[in-house]
């Protein structure tokens, strides 16, 4: 179990909150997280790249010139891979890059990744409570009050983010918003700081406890 200090949106300390998630053994955690990240990135690949082989390129049925007497290298088709516009040798074809990983391992990898970042977590009781309408500057100022630099990549995790908060964060290049029940290993590891709403911590423990 880990205890985190809870901050208000104005940056003041108001209490503590505990988070207790089962993690992988130290001997296997690196490999588990590595496989989870590889799977996530591989599954994002479209795999739609496609080239034409010499049998698929249009034309080339006639021999371009006679076999002998020209002094040139012999050619049987204008669609040979040796000529411009010809087929491609061993070029890419549509394929699936998807990697498998069972649900139990995926959940364990996510919990392990999250708990490995406890030193970078800012637990906030009332994230964006002063926002009545979308305002990017208020989010930037709020993150600054929490001790986060403008140059740092931030992952904001909230239980049920409002449209006002979504629109306010949308224009900030280094800040990403994600719902507590849609976490992924890559985003957790890619951010410099994690800002988690207090209700989101409860949601995380409810959803990812097992």
Curated annotation (Swiss-Prot):
Which residue windows does the record flag with biased composition (Basic residues)? Answer: 60-71
Its BP terms in the Gene Ontology are: translation
From the UniProt entry, list the residue stretches annotated as the region Disordered: 44-96
Q: Which Pfam families match?
A: Ribosomal_L4
The domain of life for this entry's organism is Bacteria
Keyword hit for Transcription: no
The alphabetical list of record keywords is:
Ribonucleoprotein, Ribosomal protein, RNA-binding, rRNA-binding
GO terms, molecular function: rRNA binding; structural constituent of ribosome
Q: Name one GO cellular component term.
A: ribonucleoprotein complex
Q: Assembly and partners?
A: Part of the 50S ribosomal subunit.
What role does it play?
Answer: One of the primary rRNA binding proteins, this protein initially binds near the 5'-end of the 23S rRNA. It is important during the early stages of 50S assembly. It makes multiple contacts with different domains of the 23S rRNA in the assembled 50S subunit and ribosome. Forms part of the polypeptide exit tunnel.
The UniProt family comment states: Belongs to the universal ribosomal protein uL4 family.
Alphabetical list of HAMAP family matching this protein: Ribosomal_uL4_B (MF_01328_B)
Provide the protein name.
Large ribosomal subunit protein uL4
Q: Which organism is it from?
A: Prochlorococcus marinus (strain MIT 9515)
Its gene is rplD
